[in-house]
Amino acid sequence: MEKQPKPLRWIASTKKDLLAMPATVVRAFGHALSQAQFGDKAANAKPLSDFGSAGVLEVVESADGGTYRAVYTVRFADAVYVLHCFQKKSTQGIATPKPDMDVIRSRLKAAEDHAKGARK
């Protein structure tokens, strides 16, 4: 029996933000998200710290002199939720900047609310 992919759920502007990135980044993130839909984890997907488990993952790609990130969650049984797609602009370290972490937390809450509503 063939595995059925989970649907992707785009929170807020994530799809528009992803499609505005360089084509090589869009392809790489698309591949990682496709793997997540089938219950697999892309080799370049890493758990995002501060979330306590491997349920919130981040994929990082470099292109055109910039660093791009996509954050998604596989915590919910009904779908893969894409929480944030952005270009990292901080010049200090590799940590995800606080404003982006705040966006991720807020969108994770929205995904949780949506998933709860889908189960009712």
Give a label for each model feature.
Residues 74-82:
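Active-site beta-strand-loop-beta-strand hairpin of nuclease catalytic cores
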Residues 1-67, 76-77, 87-120:
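Basic, Lys/Arg-enriched alpha-helical interface segments
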Residues 70-72:
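Hydrophobic/aromatic beta-strand elements that line small-molecule binding cavities or substrate pockets
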